[in-house]
Amino acid sequence: MVKIVQRSIGLLGGSFDPVHKGHLIISKIALKKIKLSQIYWIITKKNPFKSEVYFPLKDRIKKAKKVTRNLKKIKILYLDKIVKSSRSINIVNYLIKKKGFKNIYFIIGSDILLELHKWKSWKKLVKLTKLVVFSRKGYDKKSKK
């Protein structure tokens, strides 16, 4: 009998404005601890909860590709144009329906957990994925409430 191995995929979404060490650190930890097959950094044009954009989208994508170029298990995706949305629920639905993604781990920081209730269809997002929350200095006590 052939055993089919289910690939576990991690999604780390955001504006990556700017890309920083924290993105790499949590990606590497998630790959190791959760035994993910792949992590996709889903870069969006703009964070709807932030008023300013510091770096152009093109530069953020270029920088993300540069810092991950030697990390085969981290891939960069920009799907806003294809999905016609930067909302996480729409991107996850697209990846499930059009790309056949299954066993998705949605990776966020504890700062984002505080805002999750403001996201469009956040309950559905949590049902479709396994939520992974990483500690973020200064937010942990607040996010536990």
Regions found by a protein language model. Name each.
Residues 1-145:
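Nucleotidyltransferase catalytic core that binds NTPs
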